[in-house]
Amino acid sequence: MKNGSMVERRGFWSRFAGQAYLWLILVVLYAPILLIFVFSFTKSKVFGNWTGFTFGLYENLLTGYDYVDQVQVDPNLYRAMLYTVIVALSAAVMSTLLGTLAAIGIYNMRQRDRRIITFMNSIPMINPDILTGISLFLLFVFLGISRGLATVIIAHVVFCTPYVVLSVMPRLTKMNPNIYEAALDLGATPLQALRKVLMPELWPGMISGFILSVTLSIDDFGVTFFTKGSNGLETLSTFIYADARKGGLTPELRPLFSLIFLTILVLLLIINLRTNKQQKSIKKK
């Protein structure tokens, strides 16, 4: 009995320690986001100073004008937002297409070649951003390519594509390997088989890769900083860096961050719910 109670106590404390560690990690990860969200509902220009609940910053962000202080919101913020959306969507679309085709090609390789290419695909993901940024900067200089919007998009495609490959590969491994050949035997062209047979199976992985590419593109600073050139192009990450160097952050960034986070959160929830429904329907069949 004594040994049994000791084992139970050890089990309790080990579970308690594991849960406490998990909650600590969650607090460290999400407390800053929660703080930004909370202080997006106050007009104070000093972060952390609560001056009362208001939607004023959201109104400023949407209208581009601060009616209380009678000043215009920094127009560079909206230019940075526009370039961020252009870069993120362009890079995500191209990365999703290239990553999906690359994943299909890797899947059809021999086992040894597949392992080699998969290992090479993982290198850009573990490579420090600053190293990737400097490497691409030197490449563009060597090739004589003027840095600007196009080079930023190319750079983002380079580091986003491996993540799409990683998102699509599990769907390929779970898929019946004979359905593509069966479609060809039934008279479908390779393009028809790809579009009507493979794509529906890979769609969840492609969507996950697309959303991941968008978030990675929005989040990136190092690669963008070295590939944007000096023609005034700014994304949100480089705008925030330049804004912080001036001595503070534009208050309208708080509601902007909150809206971006909520949008991505809702998209992820929708995708997870849809994936769970599909898995349940497959199990019932």
Where in this protein do the model-derived segments appear?
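Loop-to-helix entry region at the N-terminal start of transmembrane alpha-helices
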Residues: 76-86, 141-164, 205-206, 210
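Transmembrane alpha-helices
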Residues: 20-21, 28-33, 165-171, 175-177, ...
